[in-house]
Amino acid sequence: MPDEFNLKSFLADLPHLPGVYRHLDAAGEVMYVGKARDLKKRVSSYFQKTLASPRIAQMVSKVVRLEVTVTRSEAEALILENNLIKSLRPRYNILFRDDKSYPYLLITAHEWPRIAYYRGSTSKRGQYFGPYPNSWAVRETIQILQKVFRLRTCEDTVFANRSRPCLLYQIGRCSGPCVQAIDAEDYRRDVQRAARFLNGEAREVMDEIEARMQQASGELRFEEAAVLRDQMGSLSKVLHQQTMENVGGEDTDVIAVASAGGKVCVNLAMVRGGRHLGDKPFFPSHADGEEAAQVQEAFIAQHYADNVLPPVLVCSHALPDVDLIGLLSEQAGTRCRVLTRPQGVRRSWLEQAQKNAEMALARALTESGARAARTLSLAEALDLDTDEAALDALRIECFDISHTAGEATQASCVVFLHHDMQPSLYRRYNIVGITPGDDYAAMRQVLTRRFAKVTDGEAPMPGLVLIDGGKGQVEVARQVFVELGLDIGALVGVAKGEGRKVGLETLVFADARAPLALGKASAALMLIAQVRDEAHRFAITGMRAKRAKTRNVSRLEEIEGVGAKRRQRLLARFGGLSGVTSASIEDLASVDGISMDLAERIYDALH
């Protein structure tokens, strides 16, 4: 280690306090972040003669500096550790993708509540059910509630402005509260039953509906009895189609780990209100060679730092850190217990989660092998490095220009890395200051903006740069690279073939190599076509959104007397410009701040 850092002295001065430690390499990069109840004991353990694994030994051999942060408690250390892992993404930590928040099913607090798919903070008023493992599970549940309880799903602005019921009412999926086709008390009762159903009281709800049906029939209220009979029939079908288990009403997450072929899968299954909502596989980075229990623990620590901790966790492996669940419970303000040898239905859940983990891993390995084979084919065709590490690190960027008659010109850049597209790295560039429709000038501008950052050391240089175009576009790209002092050998144009058919493209090079036609059967060309088509799709969607936004906003802005606040009220009331356009003069005048005279001007301007 360098003279300026004295390891022996550093370890001697460490306190017996909780905190977070960081291992740094010669370049000052953080290689690993960990937490400790006792910093002195934990950090010192890394420098003993025997270490837990060869991977840890390899990391320790590269450590040239240590940093620690003392915290007030181990729970605080856990929070800091997770924040640092997410922001720094150290290469020796097991990393799980920072997934977007899980979806919920929301029953709103409206006078006539609606059921809705919801993602975000749960601090707003309403009843939240979930979280669900994916959007499909939420939407399936909404369909069940529509069939059984006929609750509305329309936006409040649409609900407030309906004069006749929609198609969902006609097909028996909504009771029509927008036109008072159902009594307020009956609708409220249906909402309560739906909430109880979601909380796992399906059998009790069924019994209640049956009792009310018998009562209505006995009192000769046959129409009401028929509605309740149909509701009971729909609920009965749901109960036969789905497994509803009575497990004391405790929400449960089931976690199973499978490993093979150098990859690991952590499968998370969710059970809410006795209903198995499905599962979701996670594939961590930097987990090769790690014990399954360590991977599971890393998942739990990272996942439940940001997501709801359920009362019960059913796990395929015991946790090495016995204090972890206590820390997460303290952070969440709720108690949680871990079961590693479950019985009864929970055992079947774990067995199913384990099978699904193994199946997801097998699919991922098959897909990964196929993707790697395509990358290898491309590298061989273009004479690039073909060793495994180089192929995994091969970064391909593709640029495309999109506009309509010169309006809303945008350039797109999509990125292929680790044998797959990387949407989080995509970028759009608004093109300005050029003659409308000049694609060459647009390409020059986007390439200059992107690759000037490479020469400044602010961005990585791709191994391959694809240009959607032929000789003209490639020549523009070559000029930009020469001006910036970059290797023109990385530039490849994708010239469209006859009839723009996939498989007939020709590759055009900037370094005087002869054009290359790989042919329809080439896996390399299929990969190039995929990246090129993704760049085109990304550019088109961005251009359309930009053009639509400009046109929609400008139409209202051009109307005298419609300022920002009135425009906002109109769009909110009618759910967008199309709603404003279809509104009558009387409807427009009902909006706060819109007089009858102004409503007529708005109507005339939009028609």
Swiss-Prot record:
SUPFAM superfamilies: C-terminal UvrC-binding domain of UvrB, GIY-YIG endonuclease, RuvA domain 2-like. One of its GO terms (molecular function) is DNA binding. Transmembrane segments: none annotated. Keywords: Cytoplasm, DNA damage, DNA excision, DNA repair, Excision nuclease, SOS response. It holds the Pfam family GIY-YIG. Residues 16-94 form the GIY-YIG domain. GO terms for cellular component: cytoplasm; excinuclease repair complex. The keyword DNA damage applies. It is found in: Cytoplasm. One of its GO terms (biological process) is nucleotide-excision repair. Signal peptide: none annotated. Residues 203-238 form the UVR domain. Belongs to the UvrC family. The UvrABC repair system catalyzes the recognition and processing of DNA lesions. UvrC both incises the 5' and 3' sides of the lesion. The N-terminal half is responsible for the 3' incision and the C-terminal half is responsible for the 5' incision. Interacts with UvrB in an incision complex. This is UvrABC system protein C. It comes from Bordetella avium (strain 197N).
